[in-house]
């Protein structure tokens, strides 16, 4: 059992529903009634619950009763025994029954000890030959070597360790088991007082053992992941869909992989075994590969991705992406205008990414039945995380990526106070009007028409004032002076819109701006104001941070006063932790803005598409005053021109990504929370893939899937196809893809 090949299918729950034969999976839990509840309690407290998680049925039987004598072990796929003592009535006969059971395909897990070293009659005791008839089938050889010893060092297989804070200070039993099989995995190894190493827990495809009080630590914590142990024993032919990263830690790469929800290992140096990984991502200064392990991995069909700099340095104005990487609009380009160090393509390599000046930035070359992909590490920036993922995943024989599939459109700073100002940008286009007239008689009606035309939802971010007050008194005179604001609020309340909040004013909720008592006071004041202006039934679920800035202090104070807030809007362009899609508090998610403004259309399209590549989402913000904001309308475009731009943007997104679902921010928050907290488990063989979700997940869940061969789906359906990219909706707890 190679540890990188056989991976436990975390939450293989409901897998039994996929085949009628799997419904028969059943375990037998054995204990001795004479031990006054020892084995019985262990079986019910620790073993049975893990079997239930896997929907494995079980029987619990006292091995010292007639019930056991009348039981056929062959009716069970797994036998788990747990005994404290070594005495057994008719011990040899018991060992022979275990031997016959294993020889006929059964699997045995021994907890504590085999329980039949001595015949309770006092005569006819088993010898090493009888004991090893069972142990040898499990892959070990046993000798009489029992002793008590205080552990000097306890090593637990990291892939099976149930808790990272285990304690082993007390004296414990140890006994020697020599591995004779090539497919045995040590679970727990103990260096005892004699400085010898003892294998006190191990696992093989046929069974295993967790010996002599090493199931629990000194504090009663379970030491090994029993669900995984049982999963490997029963479903051992499967492996996790998993990636390997080799090299120094890289934040952008780690976040890009985290957002895929896929399993990955990260090691500073190359391990000797690579089997079982769908791809190896190698952070290296050079592209030359002289490592035999990597070369053999590629020759056998593996994919190696080299992330490095290179010998060529050029300023890249734009990056061009084709539909071979990801479905993109016609003439799609990513504005970059940065220096990039990259490696010239190798002879006979295939081009993946180019610049607008025809520089080959990323390429791949076939090696044996596998491939080498080169990607310049200078392009591994936050905005381009999704581009890296899609470049790599588009080249794998089979790839799958969970995605959110939800986007929201925000009317930021709306409804907003107005001041009856006559602004040049407005009077030039519309004549003698004020900002009040523009916001509420031109901009808002046209935005409503836009929503009607494209069938989109708006989440607004209401701001009451633009004053700079951070100390008492807190008043709402600006709102009172703008009667149109109250009218618009009521219209939003009565219509199909979501009213989010921006705050009492536009001062970000940070420790540097507010004292704790003043912030608490202004938030309570704003809450009372909302009740007075709207109604008692109105509850804000969305908060958009002014200037997209909030810190942990501000978020904590906000949620104290507004505990129902489920979405906090920031910006993806920032570098702090609150600029990432994440969960804070009990059930609040940070939803950073990925796209904003009306133009350039190519820029807002590329920002959105890059976000769709990364997570299957984008968050789009516009403001009522964008038209006369010098930083947001640097080209002094008219409102008519900007309105045409936003129509072009939305129509393009809907044309090329019709599978994307539009939601209010609060609705999207629920989806993102589920996405971030209820991770699917993805496992596969050469012929099929299983995607299993935790219980009580909301459906559907969505995935990008690529496969180089035909497939069928049960438990899900295809909702979109473009070239070799399939968008899949999972509709059941378990989705099965058969190739």
Annotate each language-model stretch with its function.
Residues 288-290, 722-739:
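C-terminal beta-strand-rich structural cap/linker in extracellular carbohydrate-active enzymes
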Residues 376-379, 396-419, 451, 589-671:
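Catalytic grooves of carbohydrate-active enzymes
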Residues 87-163, 286-353:
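A glycine-rich, often tryptophan-bearing local segment used as a flexible ligand/cofactor-contacting loop or short
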Residues 115-153, 242-247, 298-300, 307-318, ...:
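Metal-dependent polysaccharide deacetylase catalytic core of the NodB/CE4 family, i.e.
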Residues 380-490, 495:
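Active-site beta->alpha N-cap acidic-glycine motif
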Residues 29, 36-122, 244-312:
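Helical hinge/lid and interdomain linker segments adjacent to catalytic or ligand-binding clefts
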Residues 666-710:
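Surface beta-strand/loop "capping" patches
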Residues 25-27, 42, 107-108, 163, ...:
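A glycine-centered loop/beta-turn motif at secondary-structure junctions
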């Amino acid at each position: 059992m190679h540890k990188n090949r056989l991976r436990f299918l975390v939450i293989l729950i409901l897998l039994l529903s996929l085949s009628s034969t799997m419904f028969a999976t059943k375990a037998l839990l054995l204990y001795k009634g004479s031990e006054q509840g020892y084995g019985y309690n262990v079986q019910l407290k620790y073993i049975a619950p893990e079997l239930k998680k896997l929907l494995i049925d079980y029987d619990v039987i006292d091995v010292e009763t007639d019930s056991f004598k009348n039981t056929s072990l062959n009716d069970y796929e797994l036998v788990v025994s747990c005994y404290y003592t070594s005495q057994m009535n008719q011990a040899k006969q018991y060992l022979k029954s275990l031997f016959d059971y294993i020889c006929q395909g059964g699997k045995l897990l021994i907890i504590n000890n085999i329980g039949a070293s001595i015949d309770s009659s006092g005569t006819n005791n088993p010898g090493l030959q009888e004991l090893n008839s069972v142990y040898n089938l499990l892959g070990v050889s046993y000798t009489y070597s029992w002793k008590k010893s205080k552990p000097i060092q306890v090593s637990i297989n990291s892939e099976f360790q149930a808790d990272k804070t285990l304690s082993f200070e007390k004296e414990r039993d140890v006994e020697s088991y020599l591995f004779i099989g090539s497919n045995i995995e040590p679970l727990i190894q103990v260096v005892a007082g004699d400085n010898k190493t003892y294998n006190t827990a191990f696992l093989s495809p046929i069974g295993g053992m967790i010996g002599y009080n090493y199931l629990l630590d000194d504090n009663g914590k379970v030491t090994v992941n029993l669900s995984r142990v049982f999963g490997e024993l029963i479903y051992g032919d499967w492996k996790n869909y998993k990636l390997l990263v080799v090299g120094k830690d890289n934040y952008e790469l780690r976040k890009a992989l985290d957002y895929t929800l896929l399993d990955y290992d990260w090691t500073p140096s190359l391990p000797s075994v690579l089997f079982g990984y769908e791809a190896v991502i190698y952070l290296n200064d050079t592209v030359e590969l002289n490592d035999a392990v990597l070369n053999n991995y590629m020759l056998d069909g593996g994919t190696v991705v080299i992330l490095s700099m290179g010998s060529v340095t050029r300023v890249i104005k734009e990056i061009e992406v084709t539909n071979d990487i990801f479905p993109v609009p016609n003439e799609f380009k990513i504005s970059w205008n940065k220096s990039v160090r990259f490696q010239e393509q190798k002879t006979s390599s295939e081009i993946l990414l180019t610049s607008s000046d025809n520089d080959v930035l990323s390429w791949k070359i076939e090696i044996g039945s596998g491939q080498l992909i080169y990607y310049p590490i200078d392009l591994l920036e936050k905005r381009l995380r999704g581009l890296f993922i899609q470049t790599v995943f588009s080249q794998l024989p089979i790839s799958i990526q969970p995605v959110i599939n939800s986007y929201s459109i925000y009317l930021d700073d709306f409804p907003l106070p107005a001041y009856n100002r006559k602004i040049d940008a407005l009077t030039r286009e519309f004549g003698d009007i004020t900002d009040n007239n523009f916001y509420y008689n031109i901009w808002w009606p046209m935005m409503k028409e836009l929503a009607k035309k494209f069938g989109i939802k708006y989440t607004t971010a209401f701001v009451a004032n633009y004053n700079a007050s951070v100390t008492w008194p807190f008043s709402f005179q600006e709102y009172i002076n703008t009667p149109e604001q109250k009218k618009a609020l009521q219209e939003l309340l009565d219509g199909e819109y979501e009213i989010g909040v921006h705050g009492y004013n536009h001062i970000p909720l940070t420790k540097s701006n507010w004292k704790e008592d003043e912030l608490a006071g202004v938030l309570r004041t704003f809450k009372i104001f909302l009740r007075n202006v709207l109604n008692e039934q109105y509850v804000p679920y969305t908060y958009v941070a002014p200037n997209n800035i909030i810190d942990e202090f501000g978020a904590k104070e906000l949620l104290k006063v507004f505990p129902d807030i489920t979405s906090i809007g920031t910006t993806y362009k920032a570098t702090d932790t609150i600029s990432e899609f994440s969960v804070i508090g009990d059930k609040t998610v940070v939803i950073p803005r990925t796209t904003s403004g009306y133009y350039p259309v190519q820029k807002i399209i590329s920002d959105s598409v890059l976000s769709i590549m990364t997570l299957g989402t984008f968050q789009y913000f516009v403001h009522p005053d964008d038209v006369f904001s010098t930083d947001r309308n640097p080209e002094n475009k008219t409102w008519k021109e900007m309105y045409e731009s936003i129509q072009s943007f939305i129509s393009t997104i809907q044309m090329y990504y019709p599978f994307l679902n539009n939601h209010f921010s609060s609705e999207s928050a629920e989806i993102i929370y589920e996405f971030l907290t209820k991770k699917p488990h993805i496992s596969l063989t050469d012929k099929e893939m299983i995607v299993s979700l935790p219980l009580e997940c909301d459906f559907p869940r969505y995935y990008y899937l690529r496969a180089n061969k035909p497939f069928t789906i049960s438990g899900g359906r295809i909702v979109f196809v473009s070239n070799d990219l399939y968008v899949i909706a999972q509709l059941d707890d378990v989705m099965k893809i058969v190739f």
